[in-house]
């Protein structure tokens, strides 16, 4: 018995390991794993169902079918354990050994492993320096390969077909050795002398000049070094022994009706054994060569199919015409071993049910049906029943529970007390998709969920289901209570704002109770205190909305914790006074003395959390909810068709718009505007009309007339139900009301372009058939989008999580003083995000000085909280350098200072926080949310009217930034640069707003001029792009030949002509090379030169330009000589958004990216080549000129002789992040990517903290490219991990050797995930075969540093409480002690974490 216990003890204990190595298996190793050779293809006997001897299920090899019982039944029972039966040869053991014992097949002829052959790049091919085609011809017996040329003229590795082989035989006899098949390949691999080859390659690489050759050689060198360093031998890539999987992992199960269900692997193994046995027989018979050859080829194909079916040739199919599932298919893909069984396991002690509302629950509770609780907590109930002495055995306890006796319910209630359960709703898009609650037993079968956590779960009650999980161990319960309790997750990890915010009915109730009405009952009364207000209201003497005065006692807590009490009389309403009763002490009365819209409530909860702490906030949130529900019931708000009041002005607005459209149509008919311009103008008109209608409608809805106390008629805010719902933020938006009571507006076609005719009707009036038909486009597109985008967004999240999963906070401070420069984010002239918001929760990297002085006002190392933000804004600081995850110098992780505040807790981030996963979830979660919300506006085209002027919002001084301008005859300036900006500064010199000025903008103010608020300071035509002259003179046309480079369009109706430049593709052959241009000459016909240069003033005209001047016309400075029509606009919808985010994270090079200057210097144009222009930049520092060929159709922003700085835009287009990184550095790249991604999310009103994007970006910048190898072992052009290179350089510097130099490389998230250190993580992500092949050949070690690897091997993850476990393991291992972390240690660690979070 003792032995048995020891045995059981050893079963569960896995020996300690720190890394997992993967390599090639040698034939000896395969034989050492094996318990015997499988010689026959038989599986089980069809009559006795017993496994056949020496077959694929043989009990002698793999172990007994029944526990402790040999096959013939001679030895049964535990006492014979370990005996080998002399009759049937089976060892008496547990049947479980059939899951772990392997066997082998001795192959009659070697077989190449298909992974190393076909998985690109082919490892066998690289090593032998032969092409894949050639090797395949040898392997599949089409050609001979020379193994040993001897003294002949043949070369080693040369391929010979049959004819050549027989000729050679005749010529040289036996002097040479040429063979075919895998044994030939094996011989060649065996003959490779790795050391000699490595030396040769290392000498050869520096001597070659061709890039491609260097690449090829360094690939070979890498592979050889990998083989040499890993202890793998090249010939092991060819199998001589094939391992056989244990039988219980490829089961054969009898079904009823005498049929069998079997794993496909058995079929594949059977084929291999059959062919192998046949080959052995043929060899024994010394059959003709051609037959043996064929059999060998078939054996090779059978093994290929077993390892990876379908990788070469047609996949082998089973009886049902489906391809058989091979070993490779078992591990890859969503249904493979990694993703299905190792990373995504099913969990016991769980259940699921439909959810309903639990409006009476407290925030930390959930309603759990008794039935479910009884099932989930069974073991606990059994234990309690026994302990109480109500049941003598577990069996008796079971019976009691089945009968559901009354005492069982009492015990259940006791068991459940303070035992949290986890509730999860799929899809779990962020960590708030699983939270812990204390269960409350309820009747019925549905789980009750607290309304305030619905936002976090994205749950509604239209049939959603949720799963319940029971944390069993004490540690698990502790973690659930301390870390996952819903009351501990009030703030969203994505942006640090409250996520437990009332919505819908609750908001409506609170809004209704805090509104004021004129001349309500009790108006003007004065009350002594809140209690009196309450009494009078209950007695019905004062209405809820009555304006009153009341004396209040408020306690105000300052940020520094000092408490001041004061008593004052406030003007307020009855409802607000009642609401103040539930507000915790410490908040001023002003927080409720306003109509409580959703934003205000959110702000209130946030303020409450920051001022009075977590506990009070939770109680307060609950009270708010109860109050809100109560008053929304009292309000009796409902919707009727009469609530949709259609404004009287609607008809007038629509008529005038229709007239204007007719006017434009007639202009088009008379040729004054082009089709594109007409389209743009019409759409602008209707957009404006739509806005006007909705303004009129809202104005109409939002006001109502009432009689005040004096009997006069006055206006007050309306109590229209629909208006209240929208205004409070409970449901609906102005855009939706506009469709109900205004007009539906413009619709989009399925391709995204806008239909010119709008829908002028609204839903109250009803749509005509045509209007209904037009609107179906948009609606249908919305639904189709939703389905597609959900999948895309989920995939984006998966890639993000994968790239960032191993990023954990591992130390407090890495000590760097690098950081990112933070400035306010300005868009369209407005400050979208002030500096304060951007630096909140960050650590200052370098001291911040008071503007204009040397006084340090914010020292480096400060964690900026709300108080500091106020301070920074008071001191009008414009820029701050803050620490960022991108610049963090911690290896294998990130430091707390560079990350800053843990957004979900509101203090500095704890060590062990998995910030990578949090970042990935924060970015991925709204992606899904947004894509699920495309169709809420019913596809109505929300296109903004194009901006055509700059109107300043604040008065102040004009500042012009890097603007080139010319002065027109009328004194106005015209911008002739593209990156110019106009800013307005206030009297302190702080910039209040900033606008981009497009090329050709007419500016009516000068630098330093004072302007009033509301002044229009610049104008331009938004629909065309002008070409402006910079000097005065006469126009001459160059290369403008009719119907060759230009076409004159004469409008049939008007007889007016305009000149349009033809696109190169539309020109006849004669015109392909001609570049039409407009040249400026003086009165004598001499060339004029651009101001300050010796470059002739010649303006090249791009395709489709419309020329607006005649040949020989006189023009002045700043006049427009040609216009380029702009593209018509498509609606910007997150549909464009999600792919945009994916493109940015995948670091894809955009099509026709903008061209940046590679060096700083002076621009010149060299000799042109076919279809390309030669751009030459002469550097300012006197080094060699830089040349670049640019396609002629690219529109250049620079003129000859202009000065450019490195990284400046030469030709417009979407930016290429790789160029930004190369030319402008990491900070510029970070700024670009963060801003671009934020723009997409901001468009949808989603807030994500910048640091999440930076965290992902850090992972994308992990790799560097070696530019000079110095004394290191790196090869130039290699991609290495940054940490590796830094460690190596430190070592070299310590030995006074030359360090290697490198440049940073930006990898897309997919590529970064696949090139991670850990092969387990990469293999479980994508391209499993390729990753494992590469890892095996190089003999990779996985040090299990990330989260994923540890989940796969079944350990605690090295994050959170698991980090303590791992560091303790490491400490113990260093001290060499047995390891066990006790519950008390975990508890201590948790308490510490909680204490720090409580502060």
Swiss-Prot record:
GO terms for biological process: DNA-templated transcription. InterPro entries: DNA-dir_RpoC_beta_prime, DNA-dir_RpoC_beta_prime_bact, RNA_pol_asu, RNA_pol_N, RNA_pol_Rpb1_1, RNA_pol_Rpb1_3, RNA_pol_Rpb1_3_sf, RNA_pol_Rpb1_4. It catalyses: RNA(n) + a ribonucleoside 5'-triphosphate = RNA(n+1) + diphosphate. This is DNA-directed RNA polymerase subunit beta'. The gene is rpoC. It holds the Pfam family RNA_pol_Rpb1_4. Its EC number is 2.7.7.6. Zn(2+) 1 binds at residues 70, 72, 85, 88. GO terms for cellular component: DNA-directed RNA polymerase complex. The RNAP catalytic core consists of 2 alpha, 1 beta, 1 beta' and 1 omega subunit. When a sigma factor is associated with the core the holoenzyme is formed, which can initiate transcription. DNA-dependent RNA polymerase catalyzes the transcription of DNA into RNA using the four ribonucleoside triphosphates as substrates. It comes from Pseudomonas putida (strain GB-1). Keywords: DNA-directed RNA polymerase, Magnesium, Metal-binding, Nucleotidyltransferase, Transcription, Transferase, Zinc. Belongs to the RNA polymerase beta' chain family. Binds 1 Mg(2+) ion per subunit. Binds 2 Zn(2+) ions per subunit. Signal peptide: none annotated. Its cofactor is Mg(2+); Zn(2+).
